[in-house]
Amino acid sequence: MVKLTADLIWKSPHFFNAIKERELDLRGNKIPVIENLGATEDQFDTIDLSDNEIVKLENFPYLNRLGTLLINNNRITRINPNLGEFLPKLHSLVLTNNRLVNLVEIDPLASIPKLQYLSLLDNNITKKANYRLYVIHKLKSLRVLDFIKIKAKERAEAASLFSSKEAEEEVKKVSREEVKKVSETAENPETPKVVAPTAEQILAIKAAIINSQTIEEIARLEQALKFGQVPAGLIIPDPATNDSAPMEE
């Protein structure tokens, strides 16, 4: 494991990314704990902490500039309930392939006032009953969940389903019963990694953006490109035949 020191931060790659935001690349360092991010001097729009071994989403300094946090392929099981106090302008958060299990574990994200884009793909939490509706209910500012735009119909359904305190208490009750399962999951080292898109896939995504016919499709593809996801149905040209074939999920 590698400690996240000021020296590591200063020596790590930093650049303007595909959407012209200043990004700090801290991925793949086996970092176990978030610390010393004050050394960034709040100079970045995006911080990429993907492919590390972080267990708790906490210990951030006040970063007024940070808008995007990429922390997929880690071991996140807990989120600081006051996270929003330190990241007031965070609008995009990628928690793909972590170890969030129970619905109530995302409650702390409600403290982030401007959160609009969230990915929880490949967490066990997504398998829970009414997962999507619960997240929509708790995170009022959210516009896109798991790369799918939230519809007005879903907001209404979520509001209706969780209109009573009893409904939320039932969710918390189920969560308490599964605390032991959460611990066992957190100790399991066999969590598969999500494979990042290849150079060919990135080019195909960019081409798809250019050829898109709707604003919604452009937004979906841009988010996929930004967060390192491969959209379903992406067409990859075959250089040997000049034919194109859709990507399998």
UniProtKB/Swiss-Prot annotation:
Highest taxon in the source lineage: Eukaryota
Xref: InterPro entries: LRR_dom_sf, RU2A, U2A'_phosphoprotein32A_C
GO molecular function terms noted in the UniProt entry: U2 snRNA binding
Keyword Cell membrane listed: no
Presence of the UniProt keyword Repeat in the record: yes
LRR repeat copies, ranges: 20-41, 43-64, 65-87, 89-110
Gene3D superfamilies per record: Ribonuclease Inhibitor
Pfam family membership, one: LRR_9
Example GO biological process: mRNA splicing, via spliceosome
GO cellular component annotations of the record: Cajal body; cytoplasm; nuclear speck; nucleolus; nucleoplasm; nucleus; ribonucleoprotein complex
Main location as per UniProt: nucleus
Compartment list: Nucleus; Nucleus speckle
Keywords: Leucine-rich repeat, Nucleus, Repeat, Ribonucleoprotein, RNA-binding
Positions of the LRRCT domain: 123-161
Family: Belongs to the U2 small nuclear ribonucleoprotein A family.
Task of the protein: This protein is associated with sn-RNP U2. It helps the A' protein to bind stem loop IV of U2 snRNA.
Protein name: U2 small nuclear ribonucleoprotein A'
Organism: Arabidopsis thaliana
Upper lineage: Eukaryota, Viridiplantae, Streptophyta, Embryophyta, Tracheophyta
Gene that encodes the chain: U2A'
